[in-house]
Amino acid sequence: MPSSLEKLSTNRVKLTIEMPFDELKPSLDKAYKDIANQVNVPGFRKGKVPAPVIDQRFGRGVVLQEAINDALPAAYGKAIEENTVVPLGQPEIEVTKLEDGEVVEFTAEVDVRPDFDLPDVSAISVEVPAVEVPDEDVDERVETLRQRFATNTEVERAAAKDDLVTIDLAGTRDGEVLEDATASGVTYKVGSEGMLEGLDEAVTGLKAGESAEFHSTLVGGPLRGQDADIKVTVTKVCEQELPAVDDDFAQLVSQFDTVDEMRADLRTALENMARLDQAADARDKVLEEVISKIDIELPTNLIDSELEARRQQVNQQLAQAGMTVEEYLEDSEEEVDNADDFWAEIEKRSLDALKAQIVLDKMADDDEIGVEQNELTELLFRKAQQNGTSPEEEAQHMMQHNHLPDWMQEIRRGKALASMVGAATVTDSKGNALELDRIQPDGTIADKQAEEDAPAEDSAEKADGKATEESKAEEKAPAKKATTKKISAKKSAGAKATTKKVVDAKSDDKPAAKKPAPKKKTAAKDDKSK
């Protein structure tokens, strides 16, 4: 099947593909069969209508059109391989010649991956913070366990700091009840400052059955940011008694006999988490360093479509949270404070993510990185765990939305990134060289002998660290305040290291750089005392 390539611009080409009619015959036969199964013609059983009759009654053009549509994807894919280009979007296809019985010619204009060389990754060095766990972090974990196993006793006195109260909240404005600012049976710790401003002062000194009123700004739901008059009624006051931190406590909340053992285990868990963050930071920095050494010109169409998709995704997340951009920025960790700068930052992160995908895809191609069945299975189970679904449901979703190519691409990118980081020199702030390929998904470090005995393909998964987290902007309750995380660019697992601030929405969108078809042990036990 002859084909030629014309370069229209740096990142766009036009393929001209000539398809002899004998190569179209299988699609023609299929078209006749499909049409025969769909139409009713007097004198013929369904599915048994001869080709000449179909031509006579419905026209040869109908058959040719269906046959060409069926044959185009394979012809286009073959031309892509023959001309060694990597498409970055859907092609614009036009049939330019159709000589019945002779030849079909069509053109396909498509954006392609920029031509660039990868730098020598072995020459790249990055430094990340050393893994350190302050005593204060361990103390905080111990305090969390004390809170979990505290004894709450109902009392008949007035509420005081650190008491647990059960309250009803009713919001009004100009005497009108605000349903979205009303809640019953809410448990609240006095002095925690975790809900409405003024609530702590209002409930302090109230006994069960007593009420107080105050004015505040709502911090969640559709009325977020609006002022309202709030009436709070205390229905129950409980005194909270925290257990002493002794060996009995350690035996109650953990698998250990002493407090020292429990604290050591908590510290280890925190170190593992910090190690995963350290590995992610290393991947970020290595990938950013690689990208900084490459001049990549992204296709305009690709940029426009990605930015529009990202803007829609962010707006959807904000709508689900009942927030405007301005309201989001008030409580978020974003480094910008106005909408224009926010969208500019979103654009920058999106473009960085696209560049990361393109770089990792090229490395995967250059290194001929493949995908094993066990890697697909691991990804399936990981996604099911992340999304709170069963492996069967996740597999069904994948098949329904044709996500298999996306999953394979995600795995290849992850392995390419692992290879890239493994080739670079990574040290911590104390000058220690890091062996990121020995870090397990739970943050532990693999035994060297076990690592040598493990299958080679496992190393990519270990180096990739934590699985991709798909977070969604959650709708805030009318009377509860929370810190909002950053919103960032959507990326695949392989490209996640370009930024750490990721809020991903589960999407059926195909990745921008996909080849398209045409058109251990833990200190805390389960709390069973509740």
UniProtKB/Swiss-Prot annotation:
One of its GO terms (molecular function) is ribosome binding. Keywords: Cell cycle, Cell division, Chaperone, Cytoplasm, Isomerase, Rotamase. Gene3D superfamilies: 3.10.50.40, Trigger factor ribosome-binding domain (3.30.70.1050), Trigger factor, C-terminal domain (1.10.3120.10). Residues 459-478, 501-512 have a biased composition (Basic and acidic residues). One of its GO terms (cellular component) is cytoplasm. Its main location: cytoplasm. It catalyses: [protein]-peptidylproline (omega=180) = [protein]-peptidylproline (omega=0). Residues 162-243 form the PPIase FKBP-type domain. Residues 432-530 are annotated as: Disordered. It is an enzyme of class 5 (isomerase). One of its GO terms (biological process) is cell division. Transmembrane segments: none annotated. The keyword Isomerase applies. Its EC number is 5.2.1.8. It is found in: Cytoplasm. Belongs to the FKBP-type PPIase family. Tig subfamily. Consists of 3 domains; the N-terminus binds the ribosome, the middle domain has PPIase activity, while the C-terminus has intrinsic chaperone activity on its own. Involved in protein export. Acts as a chaperone by maintaining the newly synthesized protein in an open conformation. Functions as a peptidyl-prolyl cis-trans isomerase. This is Trigger factor. It comes from Cutibacterium acnes (strain DSM 16379 / KPA171202).
